[in-house]
Design a protein with these regions (language model features):
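C-terminal catalytic histidine-bearing segment of alpha/beta-hydrolase fold enzymes
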Residues: 158-210
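Serine-hydrolase catalytic machinery in alpha/beta-hydrolase-like enzymes
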Residues: 2-93
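Primarily recognizes the serine-hydrolase "nucleophile elbow" in alpha/beta-hydrolase
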Residues: 96-141
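Short beta-strand/loop motif that positions the catalytic acidic residue
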Residues: 145-148, 152
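Short, proline-enriched alpha-helix->beta-strand connector loops that line the catalytic pocket
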Residues: 22, 96, 139-144, 170-173
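Short beta-to-alpha linker loops that shape the active-site pocket of alpha/beta-hydrolase fold enzymes
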Residues: 58-62, 130, 182
Length: 210
C-alpha cells in the first residue's frame, strides 16, 4: 500500500499555519466503517485546537475487526507508520506534535503502532477498543488515552480495564476514562473527555525531563 495513494479527508483550519500545524490529528475509523464517520470528532478537535490539522484516512483499518491474524495486523501497523511519516514530513510536524486517534478496530491499530513505533506519535487516543495483544513493554515517548463507554457491547469495559491495569504494571504514561450511559462509538461525552485530556494532561516524559 503506497501511503501517498490513501484516500484522505483533510480538515485544515484557516487559522492553522501552512507548515507545522499543532497538533496534527490522524483519525482512524472502525472496521467496516468509513473515514466520514470520524468527521464529528475531527471537527470538535479542530474547534478546540485552532492551529491543528486533521486527517481522516480511508481503509487503513481494514474491513474486519475480529479474526484478523497478528501478521495481518502487523502489516497494517507498518502501512500506518508509513502514512504517518509521510504526513509529518508533508506538514513539517514533529512526532511529539502528532496525535493518533482510533475508534474500535482503529484504536486497536493505533495502540499497536504505539507499541511497535514508540515516539512516532506523541499521543494515542483509543475510543471503544483495546489491545489485540498486550505489549511486553510500555512506550516511553507516547502517551496513551483509553476512552470507553460503560455500556459498550462490542468491546467490554472489563477488557479495557484489564488493558489499563497491564499498562500500569508496565509503568506506562496512560489514562483511562469510562463514561456512564455511553455505548460503542463516539459519544459526545467521550469526545469531550478526549479534548479535556489533550488540553490538561501533560505527558509524563516532560515531567521526567525537568
Amino acid at each position: 500500500m503506497n501511503p501517498s495513494d490513501i484516500e484522505t479527508i483533510e480538515l485544515l483550519s484557516p487559522a492553522a499555519p501552512a507548515q507545522a500545524p499543532r497538533p496534527l490529528f490522524i483519525l482512524l475509523h472502525d472496521a467496516g466503517a468509513a473515514a466520514v464517520d470520524m468527521l464529528e470528532l475531527g471537527r470538535l478537535l479542530g474547534d478546540a485546537f485552532a492551529e491543528s490539522a486533521g486527517l481522516l484516512p480511508q481503509g487503513l483499518t481494514g474491513s474486519a475487526a475480529d479474526g484478523e491474524s497478528l501478521a495481518a495486523l502487523a502489516g497494517r501497523v507498518e502501512a500506518l507508520a508509513a502514512y504517518v511519516r509521510l504526513q509529518q514530513q508533508r506538514f513539517g510536524v514533529l512526532q511529539s506534535d502528532t496525535a493518533l486517534a482510533g475508534l474500535g478496530a482503529g484504536s486497536t491499530l493505533a495502540l499497536a503502532l504505539g507499541g511497535a513505533h514508540d515516539g512516532l506519535v506523541g499521543r494515542v487516543l483509543a475510543f471503544g477498543g483495546g489491545y489485540a495483544v498486550w505489549p511486553a513493554a510500555a512506550p516511553a515517548l507516547t502517551t496513551l488515552h483509553l476512552l470507553h463507554g460503560a455500556d459498550d457491547s462490542v468491546a467490554s469495559v472489563a477488557r479495557i480495564r484489564a488493558d489499563f491495569a497491564h499498562l500500569m504494571e508496565l509503568g506506562a504514561d496512560a489514562t483511562l476514562d469510562v463514561v456512564s450511559s455511553a455505548g460503542h462509538g463516539l459519544h459526545p461525552a467521550v469526545m469531550d473527555q478526549a479534548v479535556t485530556r489533550l488540553q490538561t494532561c501533560v505527558p509524563l516524559r516532560f515531567w521526567k525531563s525537568l
